[in-house]
A protein has these predicted regions:
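Catalytic zinc-binding patch centered on the HExxH motif and its immediate surroundings
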Residues: 148-149, 184-193, 199-221
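Propeptide-to-catalytic entry region of secreted or membrane-anchored zinc metalloproteases
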Residues: 26-186
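Secretory targeting and sorting signals
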Residues: 1-21
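Catalytic Zn2+-binding segment of zinc metalloproteases
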Residues: 239-255
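Short pre-active-site segment immediately N-terminal to the catalytic Zn-binding motif
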Residues: 110-111, 215-238
Length: 346
């Protein structure tokens, strides 16, 4: 199966092949794109916590109206697929595909360097590091007429790009949205796709995570900036939601006390430490033990957007704060279990 990172260009590796023509260049968004997508997570840079918003799946009219078809010479590379890493058949792998936005036909070498760097960042974080052999990594060229993306550096900047990526989505400067119908059309050029990461040709901080998607062949989409140091962590964090079925561990966004059932997510719980131990539930095996995210594993109140009623395993981790580049042990196990689900075709 596949994790897709979207970005214009061809990465090195074996097995490069031209894909069929990509649909959607210059076309209006379809019915699926007109719907609002819920559960979009984004980060404004003001603090460690993320936020949730409902945003349109299609680019706004002011961006669509600027679109023009690519010239014949530009279309030759549009949609071309290359393998950055191929370790086995897609039916037995987590397939990761990179496609990007805001790279012109003459900027494919720039994309190649950006994509290689982003994948290296992802692969440097455990448990991805120890399990890269369970992943295929593909790239798909997406040629844009303009360089850069809309909303950078100012809200009124409009660019004609392959995926319609834009800052100031839903009026929020750092929320970097994409046209999911166009993302879908490029992602389908790869042999398989489970998660999509859109790499925007920009140095501006921003991003978004589309989780719990329906009607698409992939399980999630994240967007990030190509030239911002923290952008790779957005991709890792968002991929963890879809692959490991992990919850956010920060506690901003909801008022009051959580009073719902025990969550299915492996890294949050309604049980304080003693009750968790007595029940043999969730991360009871790690309680009191040192954790790679820092300190010892316990039950720390405040998680899943609630300040009270939900507990997380550690004081902080990559599911709570981007200043930490480590997943805690329960989250690592959730990701490893997720890798196994993909490699066994589940």
């Amino acid at each position: 199966m596949a994790l897709v990172l979207c970005a214009s260009g061809v990465l090195g590796g074996s097995g490069a092949a031209a894909a069929p023509a990509v649909p959607g260049q210059g076309e209006s968004p379809g019915t699926a794109a007109a719907a609002t997508v819920d559960h979009v997570e984004h980060f404004d840079g003001s603090g460690p916590a993320g936020y949730r918003s409902g945003v349109p799946a299609a680019a706004p009219d002011r961006l669509v109206e600027r679109r023009r078809p690519l010239a014949p010479v530009e279309r030759r590379g549009d949609g071309r697929v290359s393998a950055l890493q191929r370790t086995g058949p897609s039916a037995e792998r987590l397939d990761i595909v990179l496609i990007g936005d805001g790279y012109t036909a003459d900027q494919q070498e720039d994309f190649r360097q950006d994509a290689e760097a982003k994948w290296a960042d992802v692969a440097a974080i455990e448990p991805f590091t120890s399990h890269t052999g369970q992943m295929n990594v593909w790239t798909v060229e997406a040629v844009s007429r303009d360089s850069g993306v809309s909303g950078d550096p100012a809200q009124d900047v409009v660019k004609d790009t392959a995926l319609g990526t834009y800052f100031w989505c839903d009026g929020m400067e750092r929320l970097l949205c994409a046209d999911l119908t166009r993302v879908d059309s490029y992602a389908r050029q790869a042999p398989a796709a489970d998660i999509v990461i859109v790499v925007a040709n920009s140095a501006k901080y921003g991003g978004a995570g589309y989780n719990r998607l329906t009607g698409y062949p992939f399980d999630g989409v994240s967007t990030l900036s190509s030239d911002h140091d923290s952008s790779s962590l957005i991709a890792v964090h968002e991929a963890a939601h879809s692959i490991g079925r992990l919850a956010d561990e920060y506690d901003e966004g909801e008022s009051g006390v959580y009073q719902g059932p025990e969550p299915e997510d492996v890294n949050i719980s309604t049980y304080p430490a003693q009750e968790m131990a007595d029940r043999g539930a969730k991360w009871h095996d790690w309680l009191g033990k040192p954790d790679p995210a820092g300190g010892s594993t316990g039950t720390f109140e405040g998680a899943g957007y609630y300040r009270q009623g939900l507990y997380r395993p550690t004081e902080t981790s990559l599911m709570r704060d981007f200043s930490v580049r480590e997943f805690n042990n329960p989250s690592r196990q959730g990701l490893v279990d997720g890798f196994e689900r993909y490699t066994h075709g589940e």
